[in-house]
């Protein structure tokens, strides 16, 4: 119920922002058109955003024949978590990362890059995929899918406002400065909405992953490795579609310093510290 409420709040907030941008582009008619588009896009997001995200990241589906060890690992963790077997995908990217998508546990997919399989031990990979399956179990993946789709739409509308301007409710051209401000501020606002929910969601998935794998230390080590390797290895598909970055186990586009304040993910060092504390004190479900 809590995750359903989070989804509703996120969809309502981003829909409202979408309508406001539409109003600045075309007055009352623009708001009405934006509202109709938002309803359609939310419907589309619910049913098809997982397919879009997998296509954006160039993910290729695998099975027990094409990727036997990885597929078996996901199946073992799924059974332990009490979840239906998700579809399994690999992404031909050296950047180490992973994500989950799909509207519910019965229609879920998990994906990992070739890079993450190369750098992690089997124990660490179990921790990562357990984290992703925790997202599935918590039904967080719908939030990520809707956020990615709507954030991309808001950015597109904002860019349209910057280059083509818009009209007010009386049909007069908008102030170009106002259009520029919309182009700058609307995507930032969309990111802040995502950030307010995503950080807590990642902590929950870390804890849930520790429960599924019974090994928070392995996930902590995996996060450290992914963080260190990702610094010099660009995730090309995510750079082309930055709206998908917030779905990854670590945001590949996050910078340090002040930019960390606007990240959809908590600081890696904080996540690692929490997991190591859980491992040391046995403060996680499934601990002996």
From Swiss-Prot:
It is an enzyme of class 3 (hydrolase). The keyword Chaperone does not apply. It is found in: Cell inner membrane. It is a multi-pass membrane protein. One of its GO terms (molecular function) is metalloendopeptidase activity. One of its GO terms (biological process) is proteolysis. PANTHER family: PROTEASE HTPX. This is Protease HtpX homolog. The gene is htpX.
